[in-house]
UniProtKB/Swiss-Prot annotation:
InterPro entries reported in the protein's UniProt record: DNA-dir_RNA_pol_bsu_ext_1_sf (IPR042107), DNA-dir_RNA_pol_bsu_external_1 (IPR019462), DNA-dir_RNA_pol_su2 (IPR015712), DNA-dir_RNAP_su2_dom (IPR007120), DNA-dir_RNAP_su2_hyb_sf (IPR037033), RNA_pol_bsu_bac (IPR010243), RNA_pol_bsu_CS (IPR007121), RNA_pol_bsu_protrusion (IPR007644)
EC numbers, comma separated: 2.7.7.6
UniProt family annotation: Belongs to the RNA polymerase beta chain family.
Keywords from the named record: DNA-directed RNA polymerase, Nucleotidyltransferase, Transcription, Transferase
Protein name according to UniProt: DNA-directed RNA polymerase subunit beta
Root EC class: transferase
PANTHER family xref list: DNA-DIRECTED RNA POLYMERASE I SUBUNIT 2 (PTHR20856)
Any GO molecular function: DNA binding
Keyword Nucleotidyltransferase carried by entry: yes
Assembly mode: The RNAP catalytic core consists of 2 alpha, 1 beta, 1 beta' and 1 omega subunit. When a sigma factor is associated with the core the holoenzyme is formed, which can initiate transcription.
Species the sequence originates in: Kineococcus radiotolerans (strain ATCC BAA-149 / DSM 14245 / SRS30216)
Reactions this protein catalyses: RNA(n) + a ribonucleoside 5'-triphosphate = RNA(n+1) + diphosphate
Length: 1171
């Protein structure tokens, strides 16, 4: 049995590292791997999904290298780049007479104007100018004018697969759509017991063509989603005579009966009949009818099957048209009809051609949810489609200008208006459903976001319409889309994640690799298969036992055949074998150890919650990993990796310089305390020293949530499974005070606050220290410009940037005019519109950026200055925060106990976390218990004595390990239960010769409060615990007075608006039930929308008087106004029958408010827009 000793991690320079098989040096690490299966293939580049697609669109150097490699027998790569395809497609643009034409060729990019970091700092888009050679040909004179034309700035992808748009990182998600092609379906008829059979020809763009055989056995056709008509009418219109149809379809009753009901005679009659159905109300002429049909299906400008559509049509119908034929042919339509009637008649095959040889094509209905019929539109194609719409809008402009401009004066530059192209690209990146704000909580979140597959978006499904079938796991997802990782909620099953080994072929279908079996020997040769190719083969699992010659060890092998059915077959019938055990799951799921012991629902939560883990102050790689941690962290791009071999010559906190073996030197930047998209700290830390040797792929600096180049999302904590005084009831968690004191679970969060000074109608706003009516101590931390100093500690309400806005001038009195004349402008009225720290936020100012128009910074129109302040705060773990393991075991901290009260082991070590054992059995995520035990074994080290039975699969190299060893237990191929049981009895004892945890994984624990032992032994071990981004500080909220809604005058809702708590219908019933009338009256009036009353109450409280009577709530006045607007004359009567005048007594309100110096109406607006 070959078993790799060490699985994926640290660089090859790590001590004692050993190479295995054909793995490259960078996947070898200090992890002791319990994997038994030899993997012939490394996990491919995890970002290739994004980068390869974008390279194809641009046609850049990397793409050209791949094309060259493919001509030498590598992976098939499309030979024209995406932009080239579009410019070829649109060229030439001709005027209406065809005498002038404009064509495009040879696009090229200039270097970007700003660097990536500049773009992020200045809110710009990281893009490169695109130039195209445009040629104008005057057909009358034969004159050719050629020019290089600027086609706008084209956003560029960063090395990490993201785009920087207006200073923020965004990701374009790949879209899963139904592939163009022909689909045959069988639909049960609701009214009768007969089925209807349909065929749809779906193009990449253009009109659909649908055929159906109904319960009366007549064959109908729908052209462009309009009314149904006889299929024979369409055939006649395409030039078939009645006798030809009879001859071709003589054996099919359905066609003959359809033909007999069809009363059109000849081509003209049929064309006019179709025209009447498609364009009712327009006078039918033969010319118009022929044009209509030609434009619908035979005009390449209007109809496009795309290469993938032609490929699918050829495959389905058994034809061999060239892939460049992107329109339908009459033959395609006739063969489709033939296939449909054969399907209806119950025939199984029809004659076709493959590789020039006649073959029998299977006649069967299609499964729409099969991955052979769903393809991926990745970044390149999505942007290409967008550029195509922009160019076709531009085409219209060019045509118009050709006719209106003087022919002599025309140059390509005067014809072309690039605005529509630029606008459509901008629109896609800014507003498309598929261009998303990058999830940057931690590196895994970013990596998963880039590998996401979405069935939503333009041209895809919508949440409301998608049924159960589309969302369900399908056998063809195996190795292509992860069956585990998908959101909970309305998007379940519509958004997935690409499996670890999946890759995209040139047609957009997902392929997955298999080991080829040659003459009964499982070779290391790997073939990639698409979902419909795979259906033809018999495939064994990765864990099928092999003998020393790489043949199957057992006579019958468990395999899956077509349709995902599993069965045992003789070993000589197997065609392929899985490449790896983790082949079917995504990266995040492959990072859950003992996944094979977890229920799928909980594994789903575990995979999703790893993406919400906040980067901690000190990252720590898991004791129990799966061997995927290194590749995930490096491919996510958040660690700094050496690109050339050499020696580190200069190492500082934010820069590393290496002198390379080839005589060059490379400088690597290290990011310090930047703010991520989600407010977590993005901080990289150098891990090498000056003079260290580095190889290609050596990790030079760790990023957020990485440790030694491995993904490190949480901390290894000592956990005991036991109830404790009911404080861990229902998933609540008890923590030790040690985790607070030692900052074990502390994280740093950075908020960005921004204020701009604009020109207003009354004059410019000003950023200044000179603010009216503000005490000097409030301004203590502001510098002379009025901007807070770096290092200042701030809390809610503190000033960050002083700013004043001119107020509206009133008519001046003579005295004021005199003052104005003497003292100049100084006496002008200004309002304080300073930037203050929002409610509930505290921290330290760590950065200030000032952009000024006068110093040449590009700012939006009307803005003179822009100031950004970065406030960081360290959040220690506290009760109310949410923690989780990797197995979907989540909970909220209910109590933090002093260390001395925590249960402790026999040697006095207190545990860190107490979890409730009842959280395990009903949820069936037993993986957490195995992780706990193996974590204990790893922390203590082990030594296997003798040759016990349970250890026969454990390789010689990992028979012993020191304390604190990191372990890899790959998914579906990890440590077995008997191995864990055995190792528990083989851990290295303490100095006293004791093993604190017995062979059953349980320890004798003592109560920290009394020192008495607990009556039963308790399971204790190390578990990897994550702190999730659901922090109580972001959720807790309280309000006294604050903003009110304009119309109802009730407090706004929600923390963001500094709103109040809603006292709803049911709460009112509760108070009514108790008869608490006064409390209720107070809640509904003076605490809410009795405008006058609430001011008077404030006044009474301030002056220490009795609370006055409540008045009439504003919402009652609104109700009356609404009834009056419905022409109902409503009056309010007092108890003695007199009409009460419902007018607003504003004077009282303002008098009281002015006396008290309060503004109860709304918050002070902080920017001009709010004023």
């Amino acid at each position: 049995m070959e078993g790799p000793l060490l699985a994926a991690s640290l660089p090859a320079s790590a001590p004692n590292s050993t190479y295995i098989g054909n793995q490259s040096p960078r996947t070898v690490s200090g992890r002791y791997s319990f994997g038994k299966i030899h993997e012939p293939l490394e996990v491919p580049d995890l970002l290739a999904l994004q980068t390869d697609s974008f390279d194809w669109l641009l046609g850049n150097k990397r793409w050209q290298d791949r094309v060259e490699a493919s001509t030498n027998g590598g992976l098939a790569v499309p030979t024209t780049s995406g932009l080239e395809e579009i410019f070829e497609e649109i060229s030439p643009i001709e005027d209406f007479s065809g005498s002038m034409s404009l064509s495009f060729r040879d696009h090229r990019f200039e270097p970007p104007k700003y660097s990536l970091d500049d773009c992020k700092e200045r809110d710009l888009t990281y893009s490169a100018p695109l130039f195209v050679t445009a040629e104008f040909i005057n057909g009358n004179t034969g004159e050719i004018k050629s020019q290089t034309v600027f086609m706008g700035d084209f956003p560029l992808m960063t090395d990490r697969g993201t785009f920087v748009i207006n200073g923020t990182e965004r990701v374009v998600v790949s879209q899963l759509v139904r592939s163009p092609g022909i689909y045959f379906e069988r639909v049960p008829d609701k009214t009768s017991d007969r089925d209807t059979w349909t065929a749809k020809i779906i193009p990449s763009r253009g009109a659909w063509l649908e055929f159906e055989i109904d319960k009366r056995d007549t064959v109908g056709v729908r052209v462009d989603r309009k009314r149904k008509q006889s299929v024979t009418v369409l055939m006649k219109a395409l030039g078939w005579s009645e006798s030809q149809i009879r001859e071709e379809f003589a054996d099919y009753e359905s066609m003959i009966s359809t033909l007999e009901k069809d009363h059109t005679s000849g081509v003209e009659d049929a064309l006019l009949d179709i025209y009447r159905k498609l364009r009712p109300g327009e006078p039918p002429t033969q010319e118009a009818a022929r044009n209509l049909l030609d434009n619908l299906y035979f005009n390449p400008k209007r109809y496009d099957l795309a290469k993938v559509g032609r490929y699918k049509v050829n495959k389905k119908l058994g034809t061999e048209e060239p892939l460049s034929d992107s329109v339908l042919s009459v033959d395609d339509i006739v063969r489709t009809i033939k296939y449909l009637v054969k399907l209806h008649a119950g025939e199984v095959t029809m004659p076709g051609v493959k590789n020039g040889q006649p073959v029998d094509v299977r006649v069967e209905v299609d499964d729409i949810d099969h991955f052979g019929n769903r393809r991926l539109r990745s970044v390149g194609e999505l942007i290409q489609n967008q550029v195509r719409t922009g160019l076709s809008r531009m085409e219209r402009v060019v045509r118009e200008r050709m006719t209106t401009q003087d022919v002599e004066a025309i140059t390509p530059q005067t014809l072309i208006n690039i605005r529509p192209v630029v606008a459509s690209i901008k629109e896609f990146f800014g507003t498309s459903q598929l261009s998303q704000f990058m999830d940057q909580t931690n590196p895994l979140a970013g990596l998963t976001h880039k590998r996401r597959l979405s069935a939503l978006g333009p041209g895809g499904l919508s949440r409301e319409r998608a049924g159960m079938e589309v969302r369900d796991v399908h056998p063809s997802h195996y190795g292509r889309m992860c069956p585990i990782e998908t959101p909970e909620g309305p998007n379940i099953g519509l958004i997935g994640s690409l499996s670890s080994y999946g890759r995209i072929n040139p047609f957009g279908f997902i392929e997955t690799p298999y080991r080829k079996i040659v003459d009964g020997v499982v070779s290391d040769e790997v073939e990639y298969l698409t979902a419909d190719e795979e259906d033809a083969f018999v495939i064994a699992q990765a864990n099928a036992p092999l003998d020393a010659d790489s043949r199957f060890a057992e006579a019958r092998v468990l395999v899956r055949a077509k349709g995902g059915e599993t069965e045992f077959v003789p070993r000589d019938e197997v065609d392929y074998m899985d490449v790896a055990a983790r082949q079917m799951v995504s990266v995040a799921t492959a990072m859950i150890p003992f996944l094979e012991h977890d229920d799928a629902n909980r594994a789903l939560m575990g995979a999703n919650m790893q993406r919400q883990a906040v980067p901690l102050v000190k990252s720590e790689a898991p004791l129990i990993g799966t061997g995927m941690e290194f590749r995930a962290a490096v491919d996510a791009g958040d660690v700094v990796v050496a690109t050339k071999a050499g020696v580190a010559t200069d190492v500082s906190a934010d820069m590393i310089t290496t002198s390379n073996d080839d005589g060059t030197s490379t400088t690597y930047k290290v990011a310090k305390f930047r703010r991520s998209n989600h407010g977590t700290a993005y901080n990289q830390q150098v891990v090498i020293n000056e003079g260290d040797r580095v190889e290609v792929g050596t990790v030079l600096a760790d990023g957020p949530s990485t440790d030694g180049g491995e993904m490190a999302l949480g901390r290894n904590l000592m956990v005991a499974f036991m109830p404790w005084e009911g404080h861990n009831y229902e998933d609540a968690i008890i923590l030790s005070q040690r985790l607070v004191q030692d900052d074990v679970l502390s994280s740093i969060h950075i908020e960005e606050h921004e204020v701009d000074a604009r020109d207003t109608k009354l004059g410019p706003e000003e950023i200044t220290r000179d603010i009216p009516n503000v005490a000097e101590e409030v301004l203590a931390d502001l510098d002379e410009r009025g901007i807070i100093r770096i290092g200042a500690e701030v809390r809610d309400g503190d000033l960050l940037v002083g700013k004043v806005t001119p107020k509206g001038e009133t008519e001046l009195t003579p005295e004021e005019r005199l003052l104005r004349a003497i003292f100049g402008e100084k006496a002008r009225e200004v309002r304080d519109t300073s930037l203050k720290v929002p409610h509930g936020e505290t921290g330290t100012v760590i950065g200030v950026k000032v952009f000024d128009r006068d110093e040449g910074d590009e700012l939006p129109p009307g803005v003179n200055q822009l100031v950004r302040v970065y406030v960081a705060n360290k959040r220690k773990i506290t009760d109310g925060d949410k923690l989780a393991g990797r197995h979907g075991n989540k909970g909220v901290i209910s109590k933090i106990l002093p260390v001395e009260d925590m249960p402790f082991l026999e040697d006095g070590t207190p545990v860190d976390v107490i979890l409730n054992p009842l959280g395990v059995p009903s949820r069936m995520n037993v993986g957490q218990v195995l992780e706990l035990h193996l974590g204990w074994i790893a922390s203590r080290g082990w030594k296997i004595e003798g040759q016990p039975d349970w250890a026969k699969l454990i390789p010689e190299e990992i028979r012993e390990a020191p304390a604190g060893s990191r372990i890899a237990t790959p998914v579906f191929d990890g440590a077995r239960e008997e191995e864990i049981t055995g190792l528990l009895s083989s851990t290295i004892p303490t100095r006293d010769g004791d093993r604190l945890v017995g062979g059953d994984g349980k320890a004798r624990l003592f109560d920290g409060r009394s020192g008495e032992p607990f009556p039963d032994p308790v399971a204790v071990g190390y578990m990897y615990i994550l702190k999730l981004h659901h922090l109580v500080d972001d959720k807790i909220h309280a309000r006294s007075t604050g903003p009110y809604s304009m119309i109802t005058q009730q407090p706004l809702g929600g923390k963001a608006q500094f709103g109040g708590q809603r006292f709803g219908e049911m709460e009112v019933w509760a108070l009514e039930a108790y008869g608490a009338a006064y409390a209720l009256q107070e809640l509904l009036t003076i605490k809410s929308d009795d405008v006058l009353g609430r001011v008077k109450v404030y006044e009474a409280i301030v002056k220490g008087e009795n609370i006055p009577e409540p008045g009439i709530p504003e919402s009652f006045k609104v109700l009356i106004k609404e009834m009056q607007s419905l022409c109902l004359n409503v009056e309010v009567l007092s108890s003695d029958g007199m009409a009460i005048e419902m007018r607003d007594s504003d004077e009282d309100v303002f008098r009281a408010a002015e006396e008290l110096g309060i503004d109860l109406a709304r918050r002070e607006p902080s920017s001009v827009e709010e004023v």
